[in-house]
A protein has these predicted regions:
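Mobile active-site "lid"/loop adjacent to the S-adenosyl-L-methionine
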Residues: 1-29, 35, 47-54, 63-67, ...
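Low-complexity, flexible helical/coil segments
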Residues: 24-32, 76-83
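C-terminal catalytic and target-recognition region of SAM-dependent MTase-like enzymes
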Residues: 42-167
Length: 168
């Protein structure tokens, strides 16, 4: 909404881009901790700043080699106004294994489709998805565990009758 928001235009600066980049780094680090192996996250911005787009993806891949950028062009119609991310936009040099993945990201230009323009990357954490425990199965175990616990307490503890005789 940059073009339509005068405050955003006035607040824009190279320093603000770096502040936003740091924020994006923190968001991706948090997302990584929550994602299981085999899981997918979509990173998306509404900025054209390469520092928050291609470069943040390259930085993330460099720091998280257990991720890969998935190519999603096969899911998109031809000539839909989307373009691949550009390695020429990177702010520093990266390893070839990272450079090969940047074209799998997407740029959505406002002059090619309706909207303000965006950037997106589909990131998959390598590995197999592990089963999530079935909570219903866990609940079924609880009554038996409770019964075992009560049996242990009844066998192991002596209940005093003093309260009963004192109140009589």
């Amino acid at each position: 909404m940059f073009r339509k928001d005068e405050i955003a235009i006035k607040e824009w600066s190279l320093n603000q881009v770096q502040v936003c980049r740091k924020r994006q780094e923190m968001i991706l680090e948090c997302a990584d901790r929550m994602l299981q192996p085999g899981g997918v996250m979509v990173y998306s911005t509404c900025t054209f700043a390469p520092e928050e787009d291609e470069d943040i993806i390259a930085w993330f891949l460099e720091n998280h080699p257990d991720y890969m950028v998935e190519d999603w062009k096969e899911y998109l119609p031809d000539n839909c106004g989307l373009e691949s991310g550009r390695t020429a936009f990177l702010c520093k040099e990266y390893d070839d294994s990272i450079l090969r993945q940047i074209p799998n990201t997407l740029r959505l230009w406002p002059h090619k489709l309706s909207g303000e323009g965006h950037f997106a990357a589909r990131l998959r954490k390598k590995g197999a998805i592990t089963d999530i425990p079935d909570k219903k199965r866990q609940r079924k175990k609880a009554p038996k565990e409770l019964a075992d616990c009560l049996a242990f307490l009844n066998d192991s503890l002596i209940v005093s009758d003093q309260e009963d005789s004192a109140s009589a």
